[in-house]
Amino acid sequence: MKLKIILSTLNILIYCNLCVSQNNLNKLNFSYPLQVNYPLTGNFGEPRSKHFHTGLDYYTVEEGKAIVAVQEGYVSRILVSPYGYGLALYVDHPSGYTSVYGHLSRFDNSIARWVEEQQYLRKNFSLDTLLPPEKFIVKQGEIIAYSGNSGQSAGPHLHFELRETASENPVNTLTSVYKITDNIPPDIMSVVIYPATKNSLVNQKNEKLLIKTTGTAGKYTVSKNGIVCSGLTGFGIEYTDRINYTTNKYGVWQVKLFIDDSLYYHSRMDKIDFSLQNRKNSHFDYAYLVGEKRDVQRCWLEEGNDLKLYPAVKNRGLFIPDAGKNYHIRIELTDYNSNLSTVNFTIMGTENANSEYITNPRKDQLAIDAECRVEAGADALFSHYEIPIAALGKNDLSAIYRIGNESIALKRKISISLYSEKISGDILHKTFMRCECNKSIRLLPVIREGNYFTAYSQEFGTFSLVADTTPPTIEPVTKFDKPILSTQKQLKIKVSDDLSGIAEYSLYIDDVWVLAGYDAKNGVLSYTFDEHMPAGKEHTLKVSVLDR
């Protein structure tokens, strides 16, 4: 009894601490990051392919919309990259928070001039620099940048975050600062019932069961009756949320699982730890994502799931039903505007002669043969799985191996070593490990140890050694058949590489380095004409591109 009291108190303390954090945000007088209200097209915590979305996306229709500081402070970091957030600003505030503005088209004039000076000084388009407090002081509401489509962006929008400055963790602002008009409860499409061990059964099978729901307007049940379970059992839910006046799909704030009115699982999206982002593929069922493009949230924790999103969890969200007894299952979803959806259904426990629950061992795993070695630490997987390895033949440099199951997510990278006696001389520094996983191909850098070449992978898949001996291609987009300064403002060049990708590039006019932007998603270098290319004379253009 004493233990139960202590656990209950702990849950209450955690919950209250989260509430205090949200209440503090309400009192800090943050303003809207744009001068005009634009529709929210992505919300905090919604699932992306391999991570949680860490901010709010505002669709600005076109580029160039003014972005303002949400509170007084100073620009603490400037980022310019062909990838990720593209052009981004970080502003530290006295309140203890940092605001982040990503996918910008350009910075405000004073910042833009300083950034260009740094780029020319370093002869590099990319920039990631920290700044002292006195460099760029900003007032609340001051224009600091303009919306764009830079980096890994699919259209003109602002990606906005509020982070704790000390921890750098993004926080939820939708339930406090940036509330939206929304009276639509979440949609619940399916529930999933999991046999959580090899000895557990759902409807007499040791495989998870997905059942579609029926219902609407926040009240749902399942389309299948007579569900029987034995052994350790868990649940999951497939859902999406919607917001008034948009057609986008969003994540929800809270998910709760009740078994006979007893709370077994509670998740809440209030803060995201960047260092734990890949745990998203344990929080959500990775196999459903890669196999069926479904976002199914587990309402139970795998052994390796160490996310801090759970105010209350009992027995990792799992339970063992008694034979012959019916259990009422209720799962509740709450969106960021407190709209509630509920699904109710019943399962019955049944006998299982082999239902003894044995905790899965968590050991280092090592597979060795003459041509392949695989090492996975004890915490490489979220749960214990065997790692099957199959030889699939050979290419010019090495054997080809299928390692593991592509539908199983990895918590930590595994080490893969392939043997080859054919790699030396000129191709040594051009050798990579090719990883094919879920129809996607990546080249991983390798470390040579004798005749073994080792790479580290965050995914299972099919692996082999390859050499990238083909140089990148360069193709002008701008036509040079007539004077271009009189008809165009920019020079554009298409660059691409069929294997390892673009690592470095440089543009020279009359043998002088000039600043060219790189749009990685479209593979385009662009140079805006300036004093380095005066009109009325012929110029020599040189483009240098290096792959990885």
Residue ranges of each PLM-predicted region?
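Long, low-complexity serine/threonine/glycine- and acidic-rich segments characteristic of extracellular
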Residues: 109, 139, 181, 196-199, ...
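Proteolytic-maturation and junctional protease-sensitive modules
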Residues: 406-463, 504-506, 512-515
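Surface-exposed, glycine-biased beta-strand/turn segments
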Residues: 21-98, 105-110, 125-134, 139-140, ...
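Short edge beta-strand/loop segments characteristic of extracellular beta-sandwich folds
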Residues: 236-242, 417-421, 490-498
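Proline-centered linker/hinge motifs at extracellular inter-domain junctions
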Residues: 183-191, 469-473, 539
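Short coil/turn motif common to extracellular beta-sandwich-like domains
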Residues: 229-234, 409-417, 484-492
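Proteolytic processing hotspots in large secreted/extracellular or virion-associated proteins
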Residues: 353-362, 386-432
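Bacterial Sec-dependent N-terminal signal peptides
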Residues: 1-28
